[in-house]
């Protein structure tokens, strides 16, 4: 019986090693085989075929990052809600209560952000 489990873990280990080794080997071979002729034209920023007319490093206001984090949080919520909604009829009442607790926790966080006026644009 133990050999079945060992065999399963061996398959996972092989896939993990292949998943790490294949990209590393491909990138290493590409770096070794490609021609290396650096020039000033290759080092410039490409902007729609014309020379860039200002610096590419633009500072964004910190509020953009807060909105991005809130978006990621609710995007991950969607990732959790979709499989639950697909398998809802098989999961039962316990899964419904768990998902309601999860959604309520996110809504409490959203209400807190709203109260602290994080959602106001500049």
UniProtKB/Swiss-Prot annotation:
Predominant subcellular localization, coarse grouping: membrane
Membrane topology summary: Multi-pass membrane protein
Family named by the database record: Belongs to the complex I subunit 3 family.
Protein name listed in UniProt: NADH-quinone oxidoreductase subunit A
This protein's record includes keyword Transmembrane: yes
Subcellular location: Cell membrane
Keywords from the named record: Cell membrane, Membrane, NAD, Quinone, Translocase, Transmembrane, Transmembrane helix, Transport
Known role: NDH-1 shuttles electrons from NADH, via FMN and iron-sulfur (Fe-S) centers, to quinones in the respiratory chain. The immediate electron acceptor for the enzyme in this species is believed to be a menaquinone. Couples the redox reaction to proton translocation (for every two electrons transferred, four hydrogen ions are translocated across the cytoplasmic membrane), and thus conserves the redox energy in a proton gradient.
Subunit structure: NDH-1 is composed of 14 different subunits. Subunits NuoA, H, J, K, L, M, N constitute the membrane sector of the complex.
MF annotations from Gene Ontology: NADH dehydrogenase (ubiquinone) activity; NADH:ubiquinone reductase (non-electrogenic) activity; quinone binding
Enzyme Commission number(s) of this protein: 7.1.1.-
Gene it is expressed from: nuoA
Pfam families reported for this sequence: Oxidored_q4
Cystine residue pairs: none
Catalysed conversion reaction: a quinone + NADH + 5 H(+)(in) = a quinol + NAD(+) + 4 H(+)(out)
Gene Ontology annotations for the cellular component aspect, listed alphabetically: NADH dehydrogenase complex; plasma membrane
Transmembrane parts of this sequence: 10-30, 66-86, 91-111
